[in-house]
Amino acid sequence: DGMGGMGIFRVKADALNLGSIIETLNKDGAETIMVQRFVPEITQGDKRILIIGGEPVPFSLARIPQGTEVRGNLAAGGLGVAQPLSDSDWAIARALGPVLAARGLLLVGVDVIGDRLTEINVTSPTCFQEITQQAGFDVPAMFVTALEAALAS
């Protein structure tokens, strides 16, 4: 249950050291691990899309891997670039928004690579500052408005 890209490995077709990687990650079977297929579109970034009060912020932060790295996480050296949501991003965020809001989740960060939803983050939905600074969209104001509405209801 790492964050910031901790514990992410890319295993290629030769599966070199796969057994050792699995043993390390799952602590010899004591921990659950998640595995996903490599998504080549990671080169364009792992996009963090914020959903506040069930509504998507109209910009994502694409966290773009640098050099030979496959992790785009800012903590792993990725470059954060704010960009408008794509049509696919809007579709994903609009489908999730009402479901997340119905579950009482006021602030959620979803991660998308290409057009694939890869994570739903309810405990560490970051990127307010980067989106606000780069895109000029006031994410904190949207959050405060949603929080006030939630408290009033």
Regions found by a protein language model. Name each.
Residues 4-92:
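Phosphate-binding site of ATP-dependent enzymes
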Residues 68, 84-153:
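ATP-dependent carboxylate activation and anion-phosphoryl transfer catalytic cores
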Residues 1, 38-42, 98-102:
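Short, solvent-exposed secondary-structure boundary motifs
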Residues 1-3, 125:
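Short glycine-rich anion-binding loops that position phosphate/pyrophosphate groups of nucleotides
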